[in-house]
């Protein structure tokens, strides 16, 4: 992989920081660019902002580690949780799909127990 731009969202979170550290240690940084965005640099819930910022950096791949992580507050702040964990993902996926950009979305393990034999749906509880 040479001369590629990789975008990491949620860059100030635990996983984003770890990815940055691993990137630096991997040797990939010599020939590729890692762009680190957190909420201050990019509001993922704004489709217009996602379009503008991603068009300017034109990443070859996106690693989305951004998430609403206040599990205990998610029910009281359902709109905020939905915006970050669903709308933002849709904005990134829409941009990536239009450009054949690879996207890796990392989700939480706090939602279900993982014992289902079929994919979970929004109606599952």
Task: Locate each region found by the language model.
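Glycine/Thr-rich phosphate-binding loops of Rossmann-like dinucleotide-binding domains
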Residues: 16, 71-72, 112-114
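Alpha-helical structural signal in soluble globular domains
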Residues: 18, 22-26, 91-99
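Catalytic helix-loop patch of NAD(P)-dependent Rossmann-fold dehydrogenases
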Residues: 76, 83, 87-91, 98, ...
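Structural signature of beta-strand start/N-cap positions in the alpha/beta core
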Residues: 5, 33, 58-60, 102
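N-terminal Rossmann NAD(P)H-binding glycine-rich loop of SDR-like oxidoreductase domains
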Residues: 4-25
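SDR active-site strand-loop-helix element
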Residues: 9, 37, 62-66, 103-108, ...
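NAD(P)H-binding glycine-rich loop region in Rossmannoid oxidoreductase-like domains
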Residues: 47-84, 97
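Adenosine-cofactor binding site in Rossmann-like domains, unifying the SAM/SAH pocket
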Residues: 26-52
